């Protein structure tokens, strides 16, 4: 694993860094020659590593100390080269920013250039020697131990690619030892789907989720019951992990007919299997399918005879594979983690010997948190505790403190170790591995904002911008991690885009250990040990870092710094940093305005997030020429210096700020903007009273794609001409241009909405959010081209306004927030393309929906605690419906009615409850404190099959919409199966509109599986 990450690092990062140096400096020929030598040598080293990695893992039974040392050598070398290049860039950037000298500028510049070239030449000679020495050492010592892979978790890595033995469910070791706890509802629903007579054609049921959640165990339970029942003429269980489609088909044929050898090619095997299954009712389980191509090759073997009712169950860890498997006549079942009660029951069952059954159990809260409801983790940890004499042996707290060590070395935890290693090693390329390890920068249970995370990845250089021609952009990298269920969504926005996420408990432990072992991230948490060289530093815990803690630590090489809590004077001495690219001080308690002077000298900084007591940004922020993202939402900054808008690389500016009228004066910034040099794409946002000079600057921001404005009244602010002209220019429809997404959010407080009533067409927006008093729909809304997402918030919506909305033929998402709605009928012709309808009301005045209306509706959200029953809404008419969300305050009778209606719907849509925790009306609400409130308040009301209502702790299914990042446009709905949870918030929570933040918690009424429709 370590070798793969290092190999990818050299191949992907180094050429780009050298190219950057050539662009920045006028290098001597000798220096360029040394660079060429290093590139060629490193390519040879990469080739040697790749060849070594290609050796079959099964030959490496144990870690090789020699190979481990080689990897350490090469890692140190790679880091040294990066440090060298970044150091040169740092010195060059510092020199460019110096404004004056006693010597003439040309003479001084020439002298500095010579010094830089000389220093670089010396560094390259040193690195050249390091390369030669590393190569010689590898040649001297690796010949005796070919194919050995010394790396963290190496034995697990060697074994992880070994396929599980060809087996039936009864002999599969994972299933044989499985403990089915807390799966009654899942099992009942799965058996019901297998027994259901409609449809009679072949049905595929996909069970998807992170490794170790019990997918195989659940499938095995159903398989064993069905094979005993005699309802199927043919049945077979095959394991697809690490096998080609031909191998899977061959095994399947042998399971169906023992007389067959299954040695043909894939095409012939498909023919043979079809002949065996033709005109017969069969039940097949394919465990652990890993690619869509694998499924495409396998599925053609199954006859689709009608009126027979055959069933196929597949399990997979990859969401897109599950969607492909059940894309037609299928159901998708997303595995959930166990709740606290079931987790504790399973852990105690495995950990506590029977003779201690009446003994008071030790406190297991800490280890339960680490296991995070993952059955495999609970089982293996329980077995470890029992093997070590629990409850009289090591307690859970001791295990938690040394969990990294035990995961790496203890044989009892081998199954858990193999699962974690597999998820890491299966990621294609080094970039994804680096992106995953970056999650180690954040504390456990910390909700991570997706957009913020992507901007950090970009600043670090792990991935490329979406607009680049790179094979892996930032969004694609995040989507891969989500698709593989390695990270989980916490909050999903209007357009089904993840807004916040986190890693699972055991995966978090694995990431933490890998980050430390490879010196990828250094943690300072409760006075832990620090290495000599630190490149990414994360501080969290109660320990303040002082000078004694950091003796001998070189902070000049740090690329990313994240602080949660107090940092101390040593860490906040920014004169010690040189190569810093990412600086996150949102949660730094002892940050103040005095620190900004040195922060403005961090010339390589690309991402800056401020909080704490920061109240004023200095003009020197103009020195940060490489800055791409500036986030002051959690700071006290009210006035944004105009110099910020002159930053040439700035793309994202986030906060709630004003500018003075002095902006109208001719300045260098205005001259810079007038030349079209601004790269600003996100401005969310600024507060305007209609007369501020910022509106004059907007006309030059030609790349702006997301704009958020708070419109407030003040004395003398009666002329809104500037605001109207600025908005008019922003929404201008340039039909010949490739506009892409464009989002506008307007919040009117104490002022008239007349500024937008006179906007004229042609205009283009993909997303629009309006909050204010709207007796009528602003005329420009109906003429917007490309509008797919619309959110409106007002006291009351009139019939005329609602009827005008229904004519928006391209609208895909509609959200209405009000006290009440006037009488309104959604007719068959209204909202022809609507996918999601969200209505948030104080009074249950929901519209009447004609039968046949909203033909493509996927998600219906009716958020009113006084909702009574079904309110005459016939959900059976919505053929593609997948999810219904209700206010958690509705009566039990209403919940029961919706669950019953959902169970009778052909798609079995989810029924979710949204529970709100009101917070103060503030744009800077602490997301983490809100998250804790949600977790403590959340419960799930589960309607068990054939049983009474149960109340289950529901920490695992929740939603948080803190209103900090607006959603982008809903581009398209590829399928209706991949809807993780409810999309929005409750009761005057209106994305990015400055309303009271509300933290809703989602709980599910698991009436059935999530269907996949096309």
Curated annotation (Swiss-Prot):
Keywords: ATP-binding, Coiled coil, Leucine-rich repeat, Nucleotide-binding, Plant defense, Repeat. GO terms for biological process: defense response to other organism. Residues 1-182 are annotated as: Structured coiled coil (CC) domain. Disulfide bonds: none annotated. InterPro entries: Apaf_helical (IPR042197), Disease_R_plants (IPR044974), LRR_dom_sf (IPR032675), LRR_R13L4/SHOC2-like (IPR055414), NB-ARC (IPR002182), P-loop_NTPase (IPR027417), Rx_N (IPR041118), WH-like_DNA-bd_sf (IPR036388). Expressed in leaves. It comes from the Eukaryota. Pfam families: LRR_14, NB-ARC, Rx_N, WH_DRP. Residues 105-145 form a coiled coil. LRR repeats lie at residues 484-506, 507-530, 531-552, 580-602, 603-624, 625-647, 701-725, 762-784, 785-807, 808-833, 854-877. GO terms for molecular function: ADP binding; ATP binding. The keyword Coiled coil applies. Residues 189-466 form the NB-ARC domain. Belongs to the disease resistance NB-LRR family. Probable disease resistance protein. Resistance proteins guard the plant against pathogens that contain an appropriate avirulence protein via an indirect interaction with this avirulence protein. That triggers a defense system including the hypersensitive response, which restricts the pathogen growth. At the opposite of cultivars Aichi asahi and Sasanishiki, the cultivars Nipponbare, Mokoto and Hitomebore don't recognize the effector avirulence protein AVR-Pia from M.oryzae. This is Disease resistance protein RGA4. The lineage of its organism: Eukaryota, Viridiplantae, Streptophyta, Embryophyta, Tracheophyta. The gene is RGA4.
């Amino acid at each position: 694993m370590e070798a793969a990450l290092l190999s990818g690092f050299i191949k992907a990062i180094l050429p780009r860094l050298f190219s950057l140096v050539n662009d920045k400096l006028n290098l001597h020929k000798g220096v360029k020659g040394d660079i060429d030598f290093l590139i060629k040598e490193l390519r040879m080293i990469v080739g040697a590593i790749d060849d070594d990695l290609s050796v079959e893992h099964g030959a490496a039974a144990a870690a090789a100390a020699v190979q481990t040392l080689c990897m350490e050598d090469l890692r140190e070398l790679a880091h040294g080269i990066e440090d060298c290049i970044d150091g040169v860039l740092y010195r060059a950037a510092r020199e460019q920013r110096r404004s004056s000298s006693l010597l003439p500028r040309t003479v001084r510049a020439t002298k500095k250039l010579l010094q830089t070239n000389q220093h670089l030449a010396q560094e390259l000679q040193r690195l050249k020697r390091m390369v030669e020495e590393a190569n010689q050492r590898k040649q001297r010592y690796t010949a005796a131990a070919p194919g050995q892979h010394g790396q963290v978790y190496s034995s697990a890595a060697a074994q992880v690619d070994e396929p599980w033995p060809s087996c039936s469910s009864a002999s599969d070791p994972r299933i044989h030892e499985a403990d089915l706890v807390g799966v009654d509802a899942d099992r009942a629903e799965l058996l019901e789907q297998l027994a259901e007579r409609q449809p009679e054609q072949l049905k595929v049921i996909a069970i998807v989720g992170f490794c170790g959640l019990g997918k195989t165990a659940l499938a095995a339970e159903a398989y064993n019951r069905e094979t005993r029942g005699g309802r199927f003429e043919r049945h077979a269980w095959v394991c697809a992990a690490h096998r080609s489609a031909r191998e899977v088909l061959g095994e399947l044929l042998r399971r169906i007919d023992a007389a067959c050898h299954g040695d043909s090619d894939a095409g012939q095997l498909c023919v043979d299997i079809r002949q065996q299954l033709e005109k017969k009712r069969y039940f097949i389980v394919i465990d652990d399918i890993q690619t869509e191509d694998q499924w495409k090759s396998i599925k053609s073997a199954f006859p689709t005879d009608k009126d027979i009712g055959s069933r196929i169950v597949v399990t997979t860890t990859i969401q897109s594979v599950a969607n492909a498997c059940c894309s037609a006549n299928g159901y998708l079942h997303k595995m959930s983690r166990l709740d606290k009660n079931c987790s504790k029951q399973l852990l105690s069952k495995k950990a506590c010997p029977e003779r201690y059954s009446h003994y008071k159990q030790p406190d297991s809260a800490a280890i339960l948190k680490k296991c995070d409801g993952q059955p495999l983790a609970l089982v293996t940890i329980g077995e470890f505790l029992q093997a070590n004499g629990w409850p009289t042996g090591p307690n859970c707290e001791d295990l938690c403190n040394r969990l990294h060590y035990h995961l790496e070395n203890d044989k009892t935890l081998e199954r858990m170790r193999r699962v974690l290693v597999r998820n890491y090693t299966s990621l294609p390329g080094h970039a994804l591995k680096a992106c995953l390890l970056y999650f180690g920068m954040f504390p456990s249970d910390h909700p991570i904002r997706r957009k913020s995370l992507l901007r950090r990845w970009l600043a670090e250089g792990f991935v490329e911008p979406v607009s680049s021609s790179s094979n892996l952009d930032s969004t694609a990298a995040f989507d891969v991690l989500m698709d593989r269920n390695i990270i989980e969504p916490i909050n999903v926005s209007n357009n089904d885009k993840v807004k916040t996420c986190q890693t699972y408990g055991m995966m978090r432990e694995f990431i933490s250990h890998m980050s430390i072992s490879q010196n990828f991230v250094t943690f300072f948490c409760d006075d832990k040990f620090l290495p000599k060289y630190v490149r990414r530093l994360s501080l969290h815990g109660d320990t303040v870092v002082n000078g004694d803690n950091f003796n001998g630590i070189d902070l000049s090489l740090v690329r990313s710094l994240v602080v949660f809590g107090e940092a101390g004077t040593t860490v906040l001495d920014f004169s010690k940093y040189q190569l810093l690219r990412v600086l996150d001080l949102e949660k730094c308690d002892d940050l103040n305005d005095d620190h900004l002077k040195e922060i403005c000298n961090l010339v390589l900084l690309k991402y800056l997030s401020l909080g704490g007591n920061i109240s004023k940004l200095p003009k020197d922020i103009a020195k940060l020429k490489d800055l791409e993202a500036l986030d002051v939402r959690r700071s006290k900054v009210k006035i944004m210096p105009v110099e910020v808008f002159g930053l040439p690389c700035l793309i994202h500016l986030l906060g709630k700020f004003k500018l003075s009228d002095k902006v109208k004066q001719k300045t260098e910034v205005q001259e810079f903007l007038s030349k079209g040099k601004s790269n600003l794409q996100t401005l969310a946002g600024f507060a305007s009273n209609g007369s501020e000079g910022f509106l004059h600057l907007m006309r030059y921001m030609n790349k702006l794609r997301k704009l958020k404005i708070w419109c407030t009244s003040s004395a003398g602010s009666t002329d809104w001409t500037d605001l109207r002209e600025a908005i008019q220019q922003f929404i201008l429809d340039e039909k010949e241009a490739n506009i892409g997404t464009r989002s506008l959010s307007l919040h009117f407080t104490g002022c008239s909405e007349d500024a937008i009533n006179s906007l004229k067409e042609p205009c283009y927006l993909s997303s629009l959010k309006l909050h204010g008093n709207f007796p009528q729909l602003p005329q420009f809304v109906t003429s917007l081209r490309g509008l797919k997402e619309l959110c409106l918030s007002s006291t009351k919506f009139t019939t005329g306004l609602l009827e005008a909305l229904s004519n928006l033929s391209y609208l895909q998402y509609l959200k209405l927030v009000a006290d009440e709605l006037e009488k309104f009928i959604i007719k068959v012709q209204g909202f022809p393309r609507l996918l999601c309808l969200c209505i948030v009301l104080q009074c249950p005045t929901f519209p009447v929906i004609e039968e046949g209306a909203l033909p493509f509706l996927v998600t219906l959200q009716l958020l009113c605690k006084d909702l009574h029953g079904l309110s005459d809404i016939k959900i059976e008419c919505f053929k593609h419906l997948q999810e219904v969300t209700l206010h958690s305050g509705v009566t039990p009778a209403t919940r029961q009615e919706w669950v019953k209606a959902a169970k009778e719907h052909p798609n079995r849509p989810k029924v979710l409850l949204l529970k709100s925790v009101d917070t103060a009306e503030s744009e800077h609400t602490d997301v983490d404190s809100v998250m804790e409130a949600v977790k403590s308040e959340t419960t799930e009301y589960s309607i068990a099959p054939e049983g009474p209502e149960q109340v289950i702790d529901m920490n695992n299914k929740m939603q948080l919409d803190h209103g900090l990042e607006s959603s982008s446009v809903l581009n398209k709905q590829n399928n209706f199966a991949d809807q993780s949870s409810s999309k929005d918030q409750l009761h005057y929570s209106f994305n990015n509109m400055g309303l009271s933040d509300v933290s809703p918690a989602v709980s599910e009424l698991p009436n059935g599986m999530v269907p996949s429709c096309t």
